[in-house]
Regions:
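Membrane-interface "cap" regions at the ends of multi-pass membrane proteins
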Residues: 1-39, 43-48, 62-67, 78-79
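Lipid-exposed faces of alpha-helical membrane segments in multi-pass integral membrane proteins
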Residues: 26, 30, 53, 57-61, ...
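Hydrophobic, small-residue-rich membrane helices and short re-entrant helix-turn-helix hairpins
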Residues: 9-11, 187-200, 271-305, 405-406, ...
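Membrane-interface loop-to-helix entry segments
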Residues: 169-233, 295-300, 450-455
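TM-loop-TM module centered on a large, flexible mid-protein loop between adjacent transmembrane helices
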Residues: 84-85, 91, 124-142, 231-251, ...
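Hydrophobic, membrane-embedded alpha-helices of multi-pass small-molecule transporters
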Residues: 16, 20-33, 171-181, 237-305, ...
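Hydrophobic transmembrane alpha-helices that form the core helical bundles
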Residues: 40-43, 55, 62-178, 183, ...
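Juxtamembrane helix-boundary/capping and inter-helix hinge elements in multi-pass membrane proteins
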Residues: 43-47, 75-80, 88-94, 281-290, ...
Length: 455
């Protein structure tokens, strides 16, 4: 069923080659997650062995998904991606449900989360421009609490709680990035693709730098032995496993399985968005060949880099860090926000992966490898990575809403193209809602929204 449309039969121009399509796959996958989420995951599962198992499972799921989508993309080489596949395979209702969940949470939420992540690392260079306490512009008291009464618990469990609503400089900058990249992509797919290629190559170099520094320059064999000795032992002894046992009345092994599954939220988020390139199938040259090939090449390359990156983390930092020290440093930083960098300086090894400052494991590794410039270089590299990731998502996902609008399932104006052959109205709508989500919560909250809706 290789019904390849004639170039331009839907108004799009086929200007994306194999290299750019592969860079779109890799660029959409590699954002901020790989440099952050291993910290939270290690707090869940404890041992480095389990941490690697979760990343390998994520890799297996991603590559298998990429192979499936490669077949679908070859069969339906038109704009629309997952929406088109669901509509053709089942019914327009399934396409409608997916498309609107993508707009309200999955895709726009991902754009918002990665734009906010950019400012987390901007805060390494200039704290007042980041997302920390020193960058807060507005803090309004509010009491929001969502309880959940479990039959076996005498008291309800609080599953969401917030005491303040804050607006930071970082959120304003994140909104500005979304506006800037939306404008660039309104100028034509060639402009957006050029930005994507440049920033994807740069981010892959940054990821490679972490791997080289961790597995070569800064490898600490004492830390490696420590991580190997504790690879599996602490698996059912983490705080979160204990809490899960208390809340669910499960045994330790079942509780750990539940926590480990929840921990994969982070790795799945880091490997998410690989399928987004299928949204641009109407603009890819020779889509019957280039779409499947770009998906296979992109997913395999990124997953290999992700596993190597985690090995680099564990070659430099102990998986389990000093929780008491981390708590002490956090309290001191809250009292003296202007001295945050000085307070944390020199403690990367003691904090390890699990207690890394603001979960920034990649920065911690570079700080150990080269105190002084390493931390700054890594922050710059991750900012490049997140900037390119935001551009890639903005470029591709607007095509989803265009396809929905053409079928009468989205706002009609989103189904139009401007004089440069791009869905400008769809891009603008996407930008507006993404900015609303930027101001709706923290990075971790946005991440939870996205993965919950995706699953």
């Amino acid at each position: 069923m290789n019904c390849q449309p004639a170039p331009g039969d839907d108004g799009f121009h086929r200007r994306i080659g194999l290299f750019t399509a592969t860079m779109l796959v890799a660029g959409n996958m590699v954002g901020s997650g790989i440099f952050i989420v291993s910290s939270d995951m290690s707090r869940d599962v404890g041992g480095g062995g389990w941490l690697l198992v979760l990343w390998l499972l994520t890799g297996l799921m991603t590559v298998l998904g990429g192979l499936c989508y490669a077949e679908l993309a070859g069969a339906f080489p038109k704009a629309g991606g997952q929406y088109l596949f669901l509509k053709e395979a089942f019914s327009p209702l399934w396409g409608f449900l997916y498309g609107w969940s993508a707009f309200t949470v999955i895709q726009c939420g991902s754009i918002a989360a990665v734009a906010v992540a950019f400012t987390k690392f901007l805060g390494v260079l200039w704290p007042v421009l980041g997302a920390g306490a020193e960058a807060t512009l507005l803090k309004v008291p509010m009491e929001v609490s969502v309880p959940l009464q479990l039959p076996w618990m005498p008291e309800p469990v609080i599953i969401f709680e917030r005491h303040f609503y804050t607006i930071s400089t970082g959120q304003l900058i994140a909104a500005g990035i979304i506006v800037l990249l939306t404008f660039v992509n309104c100028l034509g797919v060639a402009r957006g693709a050029l930005v994507q290629n440049v920033f994807t190559v740069a981010k892959l170099l940054a990821l490679s730098l972490v791997i080289v520094m961790g597995l070569g320059v800064a490898i600490d064999w004492a830390v490696v032995r420590q991580n190997l000795d504790g690879a599996w032992v602490p698996a059912i002894e983490t705080t979160r496993v204990s809490r899960t046992m208390m809340l669910t009345d499960l045994g330790p092994h079942m509780a750990f399985a539940l926590v480990a599954g929840a921990a994969m939220v982070g790795s799945l988020f880091s490997a998410d968005a690989w399928a987004n390139v299928t949204l641009t199938a109407g603009e890819v040259k020779n889509p019957g060949r280039n779409m499947p090939l770009s998906l296979v090449l992109g997913t395999c390359m990124v997953i290999a880099l992700y596993v190597l990156c985690n090995l680099a983390y564990m070659a430099v930092l102990p998986v389990t860090g000093n929780e008491a020290l981390a708590s002490q440093l956090r309290e001191q930083a809250e009292r003296e926000p202007g001295r945050t960098a000085a307070i944390y300086s020199g403690h990367a090894k003691e904090l390890g992966i699990s207690q890394a400052q603001d979960d920034r494991v990649g920065t911690a590794v570079m700080d150990v490898a080269s105190p002084g410039w390493g931390r700054v270089a890594m922050a710059c590299g991750i900012m490049v990575s997140t900037f390119g990731c935001v551009n890639g998502m903005i470029l591709v996902t607007a095509r989803l809403y265009w396809a929905m609008a053409r079928d009468g399932l989205f706002f009609r104006v989103a189904g139009t193209l401007n004089s440069r052959g791009v869905p400008q109205a769809s891009l603008i709508m996407q930008a507006v809602w993404s900015i609303v989500l930027v101001f709706s919560g923290t990075y971790s909250e946005l991440l939870d929204y996205v993965i919950f809706a995706s699953l």
